[in-house]
């Protein structure tokens, strides 16, 4: 497929959110291998920009996200109706999830719980939307694979979409611009009706006839927003040049999944001459071998009238046109023929997951590690001990290419009074390459300077990451504290950008250091397009600064309180001024408690240290803090019903924003340069004496409104205590690491 057309070169450069919703019953089990080979793997290859390979660097950074939802029937009780996998950007890992599905149960049922699966998929897309706030709109695809119609029952397990029927859910999918596709081994009218109801508003015109582009005449394949790697015969000339002359069994590659394949163009006759060097006996033998393979896979004989035409003219003809087999291996995915745009080492960068607990599946990689606040699987404290740090992946089978020192800067672990204080750390490190590779490091400097970048800013650079070579970094644990700090930062939403000075006469100008939490190794990516990569980083940082500036302007216009419940604006302004300032410490992006969002990776200021008071902070004399009161048996004003909005604020305090903010001096890293101070000048309100150090959050100068009596002093401390609420902050990782002071040198 030529670049720019509907092929993998185009799809691989698009950031997509892909959710497969699969029926996990025995009704689908006998057919799944054929569907996987003909449709699912080609679809994954389309989004991945090439065949999934184990060398894909996935799981921590990157663009396209894959997630898997497996639903069952009502006879699976007491088990849950739905199993959900946390999103991953590794296409290879996603394929291992597909291979690990256990198709069991459902034998006595004629329907399946499609509504439960689709409601879970919609919740995943809600999580994707929060994760993608930095890069905006993505290409979203929901693929339903099932072999039974839906129950006439609403969804019950989903919290957000409980009570919605299957038709309601597919209508919501279409209205949100999510491309809905269906793959089934049978032609079920109920499923076709769902596909038609999921049509986006812009595509309400009558569907064109050739929508069913199945490989097998019994299959039903209805797709939107998705094509196979070879496209629909729209460019027969270039396709001819890429067809292998021996024509191995071509059928497994699957049909083109475009909704309306174009008709063959005039230069078709030359393609009929492609197999001219093959005798009729060879063609017949290939057809017989293919039929035997299909029967062995449980698919039955092929549709014989079409097979000779497909063998003679690959890539041309009606919707049953075939693709060459090397585009997709029938077994575990390898990389026999990646597209020209992709390199042998397919590197996939990953955005943080949505925090859903991964379900263990046979054959799936180990999911060791704890879920950090950004949704990234980070090293657990036990893994950060000396034995784990010393046991980095063996590099005995690799060649040493460079040895030197890596230096970076981070905020000191205890909150410093001076916001500009930085701690410089360095570690001896070695760079290793595989045998047979040659990396010219003679001109590399002895010390490499690394700058930290939030991983969320790198999601649009996926194609540049794929077009790069991979090296492995190994750090010695002479300085255990620095090594722990590197693990902590790199495992919680950051990538390292290593700049080579212009004075060094080496070919490499920039190198990206990434940490794989699954493989527990540090990988260095050296993009082949150095200038393009530098320009890409500069562009994403510029865009990030523009977004920050817009948010700052919105806050200055009085829009900083968007996280409060609706209707509380006047109350926050007139009656709880410190609460408004507390809300302004966070960007105006709502974040539900039930989802571990990409808080640590969005590049936004997140006061991760506010859930607990800083060291040395007073434990709150009565009336010391007047933010929204914590839930529990607290003393409220005597007549909260006099103001319904105030009552709503008291009964439903805003989530994690509550707490004591850091001192004014340490708030500088939460504001872009030149921003006005967020906290008002201190007041000595309510006649309370100032005990100990100055109060972190002065009380307001005014008391409650005239219609309410003054708030009685609260006994004990008012600070939040007990268990964490909402996303749990990662101790030790300072939020200032992700702000503009780190990114300035990259502009």
Curated annotation (Swiss-Prot):
Tissue expression pattern: Ubiquitously expressed. Highest levels in brain, heart, kidney, peripheral leukocytes, placenta, skeletal muscle and spleen.
Main location: nucleus
Stretches the record annotates as Interaction with RARA: 564-653, 640-707
Region spans: Interaction with CREBBP: 395-545
Region of interest (Interaction with VP16), ranges: 389-543
Annotated positions of the Asymmetric dimethylarginine modification: 725
Domain of life: Eukaryota
Entries under InterPro entries matching the protein: Med25_PTOV, Med25_PTOV_sf, Mediator_Med25_SD1, Mediator_Med25_VWA, vWFA_dom_sf
Keyword annotations from UniProtKB, A to Z: Activator, Charcot-Marie-Tooth disease, Disease variant, Intellectual disability, Methylation, Neurodegeneration, Neuropathy, Nucleus, Transcription, Transcription regulation
Subcellular location: Nucleus
UniProt effect for mutating residue 39 to C: In BVSYS; the mutation impairs interaction with the Mediator complex
Pro residues bias spans: 263-272, 326-342, 612-634, 652-664, 673-683, 691-713
Mutagenesis or variant effect for residue 140 to W: Found in a patient with syndromic intellectual disability; uncertain significance
GO biological process assignments: negative regulation of fibroblast proliferation; negative regulation of transcription by RNA polymerase II; positive regulation of chromatin binding; positive regulation of mediator complex assembly; positive regulation of transcription by RNA polymerase II; positive regulation of transcription elongation by RNA polymerase II; positive regulation of transcription initiation by RNA polymerase II; RNA polymerase II preinitiation complex assembly
Gene3D superfamilies attached to this UniProt entry: Mediator complex subunit 25, ACID domain
Start and end residues of each stretch annotated as Disordered: 233-274, 299-390, 548-747
Low complexity compositional bias, start-end: 598-611
Pfam families noted in UniProt: Med25, Med25_SD1, Med25_VWA
Quaternary state and interactors: Component of the Mediator complex, which is composed of MED1, MED4, MED6, MED7, MED8, MED9, MED10, MED11, MED12, MED13, MED13L, MED14, MED15, MED16, MED17, MED18, MED19, MED20, MED21, MED22, MED23, MED24, MED25, MED26, MED27, MED29, MED30, MED31, CCNC, CDK8 and CDC2L6/CDK11. The MED12, MED13, CCNC and CDK8 subunits form a distinct module termed the CDK8 module. Mediator containing the CDK8 module is less active than Mediator lacking this module in supporting transcriptional activation.
Pathology linked to this chain's protein: Charcot-Marie-Tooth disease, axonal, type 2B2: A recessive axonal form of Charcot-Marie-Tooth disease, a disorder of the peripheral nervous system, characterized by progressive weakness and atrophy, initially of the peroneal muscles and later of the distal muscles of the arms. Charcot-Marie-Tooth disease is classified in two main groups on the basis of electrophysiologic properties and histopathology: primary peripheral demyelinating neuropathies (designated CMT1 when they are dominantly inherited) and primary peripheral axonal neuropathies (CMT2).
Function summary: Component of the Mediator complex, a coactivator involved in the regulated transcription of nearly all RNA polymerase II-dependent genes. Mediator functions as a bridge to convey information from gene-specific regulatory proteins to the basal RNA polymerase II transcription machinery. Mediator is recruited to promoters by direct interactions with regulatory proteins and serves as a scaffold for the assembly of a functional preinitiation complex with RNA polymerase II and the general transcription factors. Required for RARA/RXRA-mediated transcription.
Entry similarity comment: Belongs to the Mediator complex subunit 25 family.
Record protein name field: Mediator of RNA polymerase II transcription subunit 25
Organism of origin: Homo sapiens (Human)
Organism classification: Eukaryota, Metazoa, Chordata, Craniata, Vertebrata
């Amino acid at each position: 497929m030529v670049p720019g057309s509907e092929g993998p070169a185009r799809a691989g450069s698009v950031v997509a959110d892909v959710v497969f919703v699969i029926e996990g019953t025995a009704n689908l089990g006998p057919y799944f291998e054929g569907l996987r080979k003909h449709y699912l793997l080609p679809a994954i290859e389309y989004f991945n920009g090439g065949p999934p390979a184990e060398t894909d660097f996935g799981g921590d950074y990157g663009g396209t996200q894959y997630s898997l939802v497996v639903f069952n029937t009502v006879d699976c009780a007491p088990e849950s109706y739905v199993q959900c996998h946390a999103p991953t950007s590794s296409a290879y890992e996603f394929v291992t999830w597909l291979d690990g599905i256990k198709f069991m149960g459902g034998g006595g049922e004629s329907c399946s719980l499609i509504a439960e699966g689709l409601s879970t998929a919609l919740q995943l897309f809600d999580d994707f939307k929060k994760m993608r706030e930095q890069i905006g709109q993505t290409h979203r695809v929901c693929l339903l694979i099932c072999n039974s119609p839906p129950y006439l029952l609403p969804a019950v397990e989903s919290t957000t979409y409980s009570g919605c029927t299957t038709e309601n859910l597919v209508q919501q999918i279409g209205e949100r611009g999510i491309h809905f596709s269906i793959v089934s081994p049978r032609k079920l009218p109920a499923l076709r009706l769902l596909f038609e109801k999921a049509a986006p508003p812009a595509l309400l015109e009558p569907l064109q006839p050739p929508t069913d582009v199945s490989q097998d005449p019994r299959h039903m394949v209805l797709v939107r927003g998705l094509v196979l790697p070879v496209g629909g015969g729209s460019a027969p000339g270039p396709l001819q040049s890429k067809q292998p002359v021996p024509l191995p069994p071509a059928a497994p590659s699957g049909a083109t999944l475009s909704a309306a394949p174009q008709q063959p163009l005039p230069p078709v006759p030359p393609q009929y001459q492609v197999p001219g060097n093959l005798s009729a006996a060879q063609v017949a033998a290939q057809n017989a071998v293919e039929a035997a393979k299909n029967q062995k896979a449980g698919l039955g004989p092929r549709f014989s009238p079409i097979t000779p035409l497909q063998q003679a003219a690959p890539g041309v003809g009606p919707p049953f046109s075939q693709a060459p087999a090397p585009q997709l291996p029938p077994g575990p995915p390898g990389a026999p023929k990646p597209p020209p745009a992709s390199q042998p080492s397919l590197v996939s960068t990953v955005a943080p997951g949505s925090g859903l607990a991964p379900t263990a599946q046979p054959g799936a990689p180990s999911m060791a590690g704890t879920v950090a606040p950004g949704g990234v699987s980070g090293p657990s404290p036990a893994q950060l001990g000396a034995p784990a740090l010393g046991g980095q992946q063996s590099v005995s089978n690799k060649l040493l290419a460079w040895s030197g020192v890596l230096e970076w800067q981070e905020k000191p672990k205890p909150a410093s009074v001076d916001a500009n204080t930085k701690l410089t750390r360095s570690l001896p490190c070695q760079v290793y390459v595989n045998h047979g590779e040659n990396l010219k490091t003679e001109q590399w400097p002895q010390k490499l300077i690394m700058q930290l970048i939030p991983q969320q800013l790198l999601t649009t650079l996926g194609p540049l990451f794929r077009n790069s070579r991979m090296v492995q970094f190994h750090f010695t644990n002479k300085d255990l504290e620095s090594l722990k700090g590197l693990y902590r930062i790199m495992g919680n939403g950051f990538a390292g950008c290593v700049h080579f000075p212009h004075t060094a006469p080496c070919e490499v100008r920039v190198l990206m250091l990434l940490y794989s939490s699954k493989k527990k190794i540090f990988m260095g990516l050296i993009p082949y397009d150095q200038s393009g990569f530098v320009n890409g980083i500069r562009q994403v940082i510029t865009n990030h600064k523009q977004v920050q500036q817009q948010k700052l302007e919105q806050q200055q216009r009085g829009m900083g309180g968007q996280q409060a419940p609706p209707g509380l604006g006047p109350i926050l302004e007139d009656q709880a001024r410190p609460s408004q300032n507390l809300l302004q410490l966070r960007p105006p992006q709502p974040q539900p408690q039930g989802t571990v969002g990409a808080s640590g990776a969005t590049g936004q200021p997140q006061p991760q240290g506010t859930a607990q008071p800083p060291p040395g902070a007073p434990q709150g004399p009565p009336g010391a803090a007047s933010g929204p009161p914590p839930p529990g048996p607290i003393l409220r004003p005597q007549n909260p019903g006099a103001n319904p909005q105030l009552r709503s604020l008291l009964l439903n305090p805003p989530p994690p924003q509550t707490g004591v903010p850091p001192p004014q001096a340490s708030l500088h890293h939460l504001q872009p340069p030149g921003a006005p101070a967020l906290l008002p000048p201190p007041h000595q309100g309510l006649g309370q004496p100032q005990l100990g150090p100055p109060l972190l959050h002065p009380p307001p100068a005014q008391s409650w409104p005239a219609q309410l009596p003054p708030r009685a002093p609260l006994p004990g401390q008012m600070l939040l205590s007990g268990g964490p609420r909402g996303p749990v902050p990662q101790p030790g990782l300072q939020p200032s690491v992700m702000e503009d002071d780190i990114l300035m040198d990259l502009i």
